[in-house]
C-alpha cells in the first residue's frame, strides 16, 4: 500500500489491517514531500503496529520531472509507483493500492494515467468512498490524521515550465512551515 501520510491512504491502511489483509505500507520519500508527511506516516504505522518501508527516491534525477512540463505529475508518479511496485513485488506482494477516492477528479490529473498503466488499484474509489466519508471513518477509527488538510506535493507550487530545483523546493517548504506554525 502506497502510504502518503494523509487521511485517505491512512484510512485504507487501517481498513485493510482491520479486515485481516496482509498489508505492507510503503512511503516514497522524495524532494516533493515535506518532512511532516513521513513523520505522520511513521506515527500511523507505529500506532497500528506495522513496519513502514521508506523508499528514498530522487525524483529530480528525472529530466522530465525537473523540466516541469504540464504533465510532470505523470512522470513523477510513474517513477514513484514503479519503485513501490518493484519493492512490493520483491517482498512477495502482487497488488499495489493507493488512497485515491471517489471525490478525486481523476480525469484532469496526469498522475492518474501512470497509476492506471502500472495497474495500481484504488479501493476507496472503487468502493465509491468520498473524502467526507473517509474523514468520518478515520475519525471513528481514532486515526490521528482524520482532520489533516489535503496536501499537494511541493512541486505544485512551481509554475509549469519553470525548472524545479532542490533549492526552490526547500524555500517553498520553509515558507509553508512558517505559514502553518
Language model regions located:
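ATP-dependent adenylation/nucleotidyltransferase module used to activate substrates
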Residues: 1-140
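Short, well-ordered alpha-helical segments in soluble proteins
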Residues: 88, 141-145, 179
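Short, surface-exposed loop/turn motifs that are enriched in glycine and acidic residues
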Residues: 122-128, 144, 161-168
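Short glycine/proline- and acidic residue-enriched helix-loop micro-motifs
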Residues: 67-70, 154-162
